[in-house]
Amino acid sequence: MAVHQYTVALFLAVALVAGPAASYAADLGYGPATPAAPAAGYTPATPAAPAEAAPAGKATTEEQKLIEKINAGFKAALAAAAGVQPADKYRTFVATFGAASNKAFAEGLSGEPKGAAESSSKAALTSKLDAAYKLAYKTAEGATPEAKYDAYVATLSEALRIIAGTLEVHAVKPAAEEVKVIPAGELQVIEKVDAAFKVAATAANAAPANDKFTVFEAAFNDAIKASTGGAYESYKFIPALEAAVKQAYAATVATAPEVKYTVFETALKKAITAMSEAQKAAKPAAAATATATAAVGAATGAATAATGGYKV
């Protein structure tokens, strides 16, 4: 449908602007409207208490400048929807936001890409946001005209809040800058971890939505153990990866299997990318030929140091 054309714009707008612990719809003062003549069986949701709006005008990168424009379009769409009859809110929102977001993207994405790392990061984020959008859109399917808009915005707002929890709100930094210190042992096995991640992602993509999380986690751990000769039992023995997952979960309570998988995979991908970038910057050119031997030794030593950790 036409709504799908604006998926990326909508999610990018909120994921980098809204705070991790606040509903975006609440930030805008949005509360589901009460229809003048409610349809049979329809009970509007209780309006959320408006939260303090996120500070504006803090864009420091081209990406954030684009976000501010899209964010303004999103607010305009909510305002437009608030002025029409309940049955017309959903259609009005889509039309208004679609025009604004298309204009913002035309202006903001006209320049050349800044680099492969940024392009890869945007592609990964787009994929996760698209999955969350589908979850929100599915929730609104089959609803009465009066309820569809409320269901769509409420579910979308919660999905965006979860995604925002995995991102840094007012700064878009290169992945390597987000990693403070990574032990040498972890850096030297990152290529194996990256390969294991790809194996797990492939397995999860073929699984039903409700099974993606368990399939991914099991496949990821098995691949890590196999590729390191048993030195690492699971991702939980690699502190940087475990910390990334814990940080993602700390921002929200991911109960739906689809959402849990999205949060989990996004956190791991972000950590692996950061570790990979740090490895490239830290590895001396003269030591390149010794990487394979060093990786085996580091993996064995790290496994010994990990005694007392826990297995899945």
UniProtKB/Swiss-Prot annotation:
The keyword Ribonucleoprotein does not apply. GO terms for cellular component: extracellular region. Keywords: Allergen, Secreted, Signal. It is found in: Secreted. It comes from the Eukaryota. SUPFAM superfamilies: Group V grass pollen allergen. Residues 1-25 form the signal peptide. Belongs to the Poa p IX/Phl p VI allergen family. This is Pollen allergen Phl p 5.0101. It comes from Phleum pratense (Common timothy).
